[in-house]
């Protein structure tokens, strides 16, 4: 690292909860928070796996006083990966979302890599050169369920060279509407549902949000054993049918690990004024245009190992289910079979459930018939087993 060029970023995390403290008479906004600042945030890593794609999410921070905490995408920037031989690999933001992506690359794992960013207003940023870290394979991803459902990961490095690890994951779960009907409505007509128009089975996907890091440095062997990565509380609807989790593992340098550790402590351990005090967060990205400007992010160069598991609800012990039809009271309407397939209910908040004889149609609330009202999509993921 270039010790003279580190930028010190003060994160006053405890201020976030000051208004909730009973004994606080007024809110104190320190100058660093009250000032109009917009710091560059670079989230991502250089993927050194074979034929791998590298992506960086680049945006700018907002102040605590802003109405939203969502970052502002940094658009129309020029972003490149550089190696120590001067070769440049360009990343582009084709969707206009601030996510810059490379073409598939196979980088020399013996080299070192950095990124260069030039924003639309001409400001230039660069990271320190990062050595390549080869991530060892995941030994196993498994789960235990004495009550809550928890997913664990185990790994080891037989060369005893890694010691520092980071994890993230993506959860996908299958969920049904509260009421499953063989009928749907398309363009005002009753139709028998099939895989092209059904609204009763959905799949939702969510990324991890916690910072998950582990270290074997204190141990005699480079082993991570049964590290918990995700927990689903007892009775959560994520495992009403089938659940899947894709766990990803990244090797880190000690500097990168220390960076993520500070972020973890700052973001997860605060709660009162007596918890973690403002933290000095040192990244490895620098503003060349204005060396005093803080930049948030740490660039690593490493490969990725991943493993997916599937869990059926029937695998679990005494898993609690909420009543699926709670609040789904039905009504009946007279239906003239000669008008089939037209469907024009007086109350548009209801949809077709089933026919109770040739002239009676039972209706249910639309929110009970449509799984997408609870999130997700009716398009089955390509990796789903059936």
Question: What name fits each language-model region?
Answer:
Residues 25-386:
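A sequence/structural signal for flexible, mid-protein segments enriched
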